Amino acid sequence: MFRWIPEATQEQKQRVAAELSRLPALLPVLRAYHMGADLGIDEGNFDWAAAADFDDREGYLTYRDNPEHRAIIAEFIRPIIAERAAVQYEF
């Protein structure tokens, strides 16, 4: 989950989604990949979230460490992020 900096533009936020949306075609370890902006129903929520499903821990590590994924983080996410939260769990 991300909380954007106040200066983040709509174009920058849309670019994050567009760039991350390319990853399922590049990374077969991604079994499901969903993302979107908070609906604004409750105050205090994060602004945006992504959820990814993997078969196993190794799949997650492949995604996490993928150079293309890392480049998206560095180029498009880090410049506009105020706060990040994440969790990995088994179901």
Residue spans for each PLM region:
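Conserved catalytic core of Hanks-type protein kinase domains
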Residues: 53-54, 80
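A short linear boundary/processing microfeature
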Residues: 66-69, 79
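Charge-dense polyanion-binding interfaces
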Residues: 75-91
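Short S/T/G/P-rich N-terminal loop/turn motif that feeds into the first structured element of a domain
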Residues: 1-47, 55-65, 88-91
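A common structural junction motif
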Residues: 24, 68-73
